[in-house]
Amino acid sequence: MDNYKQLVFGAKPKWTVILSATACGASALVLLLKWFGHQQSWMKIQKAKVRREKSLQRAEHAVCQFNESNPRVDSTDTSLILSLSLAELSKQLKDGTLTPQAVFHSYMEKTLEVNRRLNCCTEVLLESWDQLEDIDSHKDGLLYGVPVSIKENIGYKVVFSSCFCVYGHDSTCGVICKLDLPATGDSVLVEVLKRQGAIPFVKTNVPQGLQSFDCGNPIYGLTLNPHNSQKTSGGSSGGEGALIGGGGSVLGIGSDIGGSIRIPSSFCGICGFKPTANRLSLRGASSCIRGQKSVLSSLGPMARDVDSLALCMHALLCDHMFILDPTLPPIPFNQQVYQSTKPLRIGYYENDGYAMPSPSMGRALRETKALLEKAGHTVSTPPAPVSSICDNPDQSLVEHLSDSVDLDWGPVDPCLRVQIIPYSLPRTVKKILSVLLKPIKAVSINVLREMWLYLFSKDYMHEVIAEWRRCELDVLLCPMIGPAYIHNYPAQLTSTITYTFIYNLLNFPAGVVPVSTVTAEDEEELRHYKGNYGDIWDKLYKKAVTGGEGLPVAVQCVALPWQDELCLRFMREVEMLCTEKH
């Protein structure tokens, strides 16, 4: 009996048992928290999907009602409306040849059709019908009656004065934690668009966190290229590129911090323009990297032709925008510079020494150069403004998403997973890999952190400008990433954005003009593509662009800071010469 009591009451606890029990309890708690997080994320995503589906259904119903009550607007009229350039459309709206109602419903119907095929829209802005009813009060606006699509991260708030109902639409940037955080006000650009008579009518898809030039996220899914469903529409303004390239919008607003307007424009065969940072207001546009100042984002227009981009810039650069955002320099659009016919002194380079252009890119560039020379412009070959570049150091969001990989706080889109895996590795593993991968470093250009800091310094910008002045250049013609990549390859090929990212670093205005399409000969030549180094990234790039016959190919036009109108004028010259050729 004494032995029994000693066993029950006198036995000392075994610390191994206690520690094991504690560990099991902690593990169970972690699993429970992960499960709860999964459920919360899933519920948020489902709610967003239901909201989107309802908006699409209501838009479909409204279009059907309009068509039934307006039988005179037949398919021929709709086709005519959709074929007009922005300038022609605006003119016919102004003179009464077309009504805003007919134009709006024609584009809404086309948008719904394109979205079914490409999954490019995140939400129809149903309040656009209310704006349509009151549109005649803005008949003096430069964009009177024009439907405009906007990127998902651009703020849009709704106010119904009759019932005092005020609410905003989400600007998630494709990230679950930003769901159910509606905009508290219109972005400045949305306010100016409305003042100029434009009707924002749909929001378009983006990659998760705006951190890829693919276009997919766990909330709204993957967007497809309008010319080939196996290819990406680009990013991060990929929904805009797909919708405009598919004919569902005549004008869109995107944002660009590394090529996010220019890459989708190139991949989808449209024109896109990244203005000098702070030429257009960023107020009200959502971002996932707050406080980031080293590389500035720009909002800018995307459209089917360069004149549409210029008209949009002209409309936005007005007193109303400068009043709403007094931090901007009040520089109105210079129509005289845009319409100038003075011969240009054009710089040209075909290879930045880092990412060799594909055969179709190189051919398109050489053909454009020849056309410009034939038209009387002077083309010279200065050094490329960059011979090396490294990954974006702004890792706040990437690190946050890498935590999601470990802790399952929310799903990471396949478009981005490969890109963020290295950040989720333990520090010890990273150190081991850095030793093992040292030989690979010598295969490509030696990129040091000091070089990155140098690129960001003002000295570097002034050196490039000094070289530009020494060569007496007006503008620059250079390669544009393309043709469109196969889905999920962009995450593995962030190195190829050197051609676009450098002009964000330098804060130079830059735009994209489609000039050709991939030919069978280009595809044959691609079979022998080795790149600059013949390394793993060159091989990946070759795979990414394979199967691109018929896809659009673009060139990039660049000017010095604050010479946006000159850049657009150069883009129009390129567009005109290439159109005449074909």
How does the language model describe each region?
Residues 361, 391-399, 486-494:
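Short glycine/threonine-rich loop-to-helix capping motif typified by GTGT followed
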Residues 81, 117, 364, 390-405:
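Soluble, non-transmembrane catalytic domains of enzymes that act on hydrophobic metabolites at membranes
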Residues 153-166, 209, 322-324, 388-399, ...:
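Short, compositionally biased segments
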Residues 4-258, 366, 370, 375, ...:
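Gly/Ser-rich catalytic/binding loops embedded in alpha/beta enzyme cores
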Residues 174, 483-500, 520-540:
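Short, surface-exposed loop/helix-turn segments at secondary-structure junctions
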Residues 2-9, 41-47, 109, 113, ...:
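Structural helix-boundary/capping segments
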Residues 201, 378-383:
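General small-molecule cofactor/ligand-binding pocket signal
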